[in-house]
C-alpha cells in the first residue's frame, strides 16, 4: 500500500505541474523472501496500476531497485557448529558463521533456518535451551535460541534460508 501511495503521489505531482516524464524512479526498500510477506510482484502490480492511470508505459520507464525482494530467497548460508560451551548452566552453540555474515547492519532479529544433523538427532539428549551464536565473541552475535531441542554437537549444520539480501 505504501508503494501504491507513492506511485499515486507521482501521478498527482505530474498532473499538477504538467510534467511529461521519461521515467519514474520508485527506488528500493521492497521486502521479500518470506511467504507471509509481499514479494516484488505484489509491489509492482500496485505501482503499475497507479502509474498507468496517467503515464503511458511506452513513453515512461519505471525504475525500481527490488534487490532484496529478488535475491533473498535465492541464497542460503550454511554454517557449521564448531564448539558447544556450557557457561554458568547455559549452552552456547558456536558456529563458524556470524550475524554480520547474514546482516552486516545487524538490524534483523529473525533468521529463518533449518538444521542438518551429523547423526540421528532422535537419540541425542534434549536440551532445554541452546543459544546459537556466531564466532565473534560479541554479545550481539547471538542468532537464536532453541528450546527443548536435540543437543547440537560440533559438525552439525545450521543453514539459514533467505540469506541473500544482506
Question: Model-found features: residue ranges?
Answer:
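Active-site loop/helix belt of alpha/beta enzymes
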Residues: 1-83, 149
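Charged (often Lys/Glu-rich) extended helix/loop segments that serve as interaction or gating elements
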Residues: 46, 57, 61-166
Amino acid at each position: 500500500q505504501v508503494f501504491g501511495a507513492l506511485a499515486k503521489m507521482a501521478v498527482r505531482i505530474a498532473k499538477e505541474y504538467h510534467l511529461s516524464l521519461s521515467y519514474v524512479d520508485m527506488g528500493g526498500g521492497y521486502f521479500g523472501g518470506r511467504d507471509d510477506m509481499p514479494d516484488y510482484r505484489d509491489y509492482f502490480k500496485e505501482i503499475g496500476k497507479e502509474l498507468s492511470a496517467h503515464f503511458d508505459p511506452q513513453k515512461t520507464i519505471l525504475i525500481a531497485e527490488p534487490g532484496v525482494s529478488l535475491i533473498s530467497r535465492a541464497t542460503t548460508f550454511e554454517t557449521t557448529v564448531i564448539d558447544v560451551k556450557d557457561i554458568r548452566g547455559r549452552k552456547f552453540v558456536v558456529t563458524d558463521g556470524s550475524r554480520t555474515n547474514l546482516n552486516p547492519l545487524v538490524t534483523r532479529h529473525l533468521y529463518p533456518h533449518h538444521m542438518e544433523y551429523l547423526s540421528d538427532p532422535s537419540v541425542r539428549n534434549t536440551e532445554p535451551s541452546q543459544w546459537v551464536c556466531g564466532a565473534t565473541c560479541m554479545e550481539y552475535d547471538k542468532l537464536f535460541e532453541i528450546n527443548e531441542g536435540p543437543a547440537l554437537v560440533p559438525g552439525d549444520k545450521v543453514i539459514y534460508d533467505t540469506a541473500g539480501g544482506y
